[in-house]
Amino acid sequence: LIWDVNREIFSIGGFALRWYSLLFALGIFLGYTIMYRIFQKEDKPIELMDSLLFHIVIGTVVGARLGHCLFYEPMDYLTNPIRILKVWEGGLASHGGFTGVIIALILYCRRYPQISFFWLADRMTFPAMLAAGCIRIGNLFNSEIYGHKTDVAWAFIFKKIDDIPRHPTQIYESIGYLSISAILYIIYRLKDRKPTEGSLFGLVMIMAYSFRTYIETFKENQVAFEDNLTLNMGQLLSIPFVLFGFFILFGGHRKLKIFHPGLTEFKKVPAKVEEKATKNSGKSGKRKKTNPKT
């Protein structure tokens, strides 16, 4: 299959809407819609959704951008730091994006301690994988993150790159992430919307990054220094996430206070207890007057 699709849907003046941007936005929109329904179904404050969206978008973009700059082209960006801000030039790393989302969720739950980190993280797994599947199709339209040359019947010739038939690894990844999203959602429903704390969060890291480690074997390296590595950068970055996923799945997170910000907040005292305490305080304040000794 010859793949020579225009990266831009349309352009007006100096503005151009790309397929990648549209699919990125579609992933965010679908994720937001799913989380909105979950908040409704599980009686969480809907008014907190806008803040959640803000945290997620900022965490994703900032994390993905910094991840690319630090892991794939560190010297280029350290010598010219202003380029880090030029997101429109391309260069986003999913490992950095995932890390950025985790940090964003921690900050969000510190701001709104009525929302548990793992309650939120577990339920965001399948929307996140759905969004990741959309983004990989965006990579396909950009003719980037493509695979090694191959003679399989479904090989793609990316005309913007060369005339060599290659593995369409963007499609492989998209199908994989969408499948993981479906599996996690099925588990969520089988558990009657009450999965064990941290179980889906741990599973998504194990499944997604184990799959990513495997798919990387079909991909071309993204930067030259990877040619001298036994494992490429995508695999090296995936392994810690898989290990952390097992750590979470087997309950190691219960000892990490950073994931339980609500525990450090003062709980609201029930009205009756507070009233009783006030009365007792008033009684203790009424002391019997005595004549001073002379």
Give the location of each predicted region.
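A feature for loop-to-transmembrane-helix boundaries and adjacent hydrophobic helices
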Residues: 1-294
